Amino acid sequence: MTITPQHLIALLPLLIVGLTVVVVMLSIAWRRNHFLNATLSVIGLNAALVSLWFVGQAGAMDVTPLMRVDGFAMLYTGLVLLASLATCTFAYPWLEGYNDNQEEFYLLVLIASLGGILLTNANHLAALFLGIELISLPLFGLIGYAFRQKRSLEASIKYTILSAAASSFLLFGMALVYAQSGNLSFEALGKSLGDGMLHEPLLLAGFGLMIVGLGFKLSLVPFHLWTPDVYQGAPAPVSTFLATASKIAIFGVVMRLFLYAPVGDSEAVRVVLGIIAFASIIFGNLMALSQTNIKRLLGYSSISHLGYLLVALIALQSGEMSMEAVGVYLAGYLFSSLGAFGVVSLMSSPFRGPDADSLYSYRGLFWHRPVLAAVMTVMMLSLAGIPMTLGFIGKFYVLAVGVQASLWWLVAAVVVGSAIGLYYYLRVAVSLYLHAPQQPGRDAPTNWQYSAGGIVVLISALLVLVLGVWPQPLISLVQLAMPLM
């Protein structure tokens, strides 16, 4: 296949982030300067974000058999880049207090972003695997970045070993799918499944192993055991990336796979996915009830949020509304998570040992940082799915899709899970307004709202509220971002 200038325009975000990786690498080799390398990383990610406009003008197309650039890919690429940008912004003040090498952090985030962009454009199982590995490998280093902290090192080792096992399941599953169908392209797989091959035992075994591998990456029950420990052990900015960019990119490619290769047409696959979704929603919410560490709580809550999204994935063959539901839900989840983890990052900056992740650290926050407490309250309400926030719009969409597809038992799970979630999210929100302890622990800087991280947190809160009241611009954007069929 000949690469034309149009193809290069379609690949602009990938090329710009790749170029930024090289520039930052050379800059680190030339001179260690934290501010310079952080600025170069942020400029590169912003340029990649702006380039999406030019990609849109070029139109939808296939770039090599591995990648497809269309509205769907552009939307998810934009979300991944926003999450990466926020991660770099939150990391800067945290790294200011870090005595070891600071600059490599941005290099690892950029490489992981590259993997995320590759995943959102993937149209082939080979591209899917490459993207997942490219996003996972830098995370091994990022999670253990504060390696002098026992929890951070433990979390990194745990994630590395389990991630390697999950990747082997995924790869073996792909091998079985290829052995039965002779294809790795999503569309070619779809044609094979349309010819009645879906009920072949070897193919079902292959998809089953792929579900195990992808279930680990998305921290779905019962492949979730690493999640709370890794969220707690990783530095707060890394937990931000793990909860947002990583999940969005992987869920995006799974959506495309299920759309082109209708695996959900198999009753066995639908039942397995339904059980995983049900268990993730109920278990994730129940485990979050007893948490006193805010990062562990958000880790368990992310399990339930992926369970809600899985309901929309199961209903994918019922109509286009599922695509819309996932797009809106992921946008709401992104901004809510950026705000919540952003507050934790601000409270934990600069690096002085363990993060300010104990619920006790946030007790009475309103009385000395009222705006920060208000932002955290908005994020908790959005994650709980309270009306007038973007989280409510996403949850409403998921319920509507579940009802449309007659998935009544999963709709009941969403309702029960949301009711349980309301308790622990409100518990965090209420603690912000209690009497402050006599000896307060960690605290955000007095001028936090003037820092880049503070601005990102405030913009996230504003978007959650504005789009919660007037979601039409977001809905219109998601409706435009349909995949090329």
Swiss-Prot record:
Signal peptide interval: none
GO cellular component, one term: plasma membrane
InterPro entries: NADH-Q_OxRdtase_suN/2, ND/Mrp_TM
Membrane topology: Multi-pass membrane protein
Keywords: Cell inner membrane, Cell membrane, Membrane, NAD, Quinone, Translocase, Transmembrane, Transmembrane helix, Transport, Ubiquinone
E.C. no: 7.1.1.-
Gene Ontology molecular-function annotations: NADH dehydrogenase (ubiquinone) activity; NADH:ubiquinone reductase (non-electrogenic) activity; quinone binding
Catalytic activity: a quinone + NADH + 5 H(+)(in) = a quinol + NAD(+) + 4 H(+)(out)
Family statement drawn from the similarity comment of this UniProt entry: Belongs to the complex I subunit 2 family.
Record text on subunit structure and interactions: NDH-1 is composed of 13 different subunits. Subunits NuoA, H, J, K, L, M, N constitute the membrane sector of the complex.
Protein name: NADH-quinone oxidoreductase subunit N
Gene name as annotated: nuoN
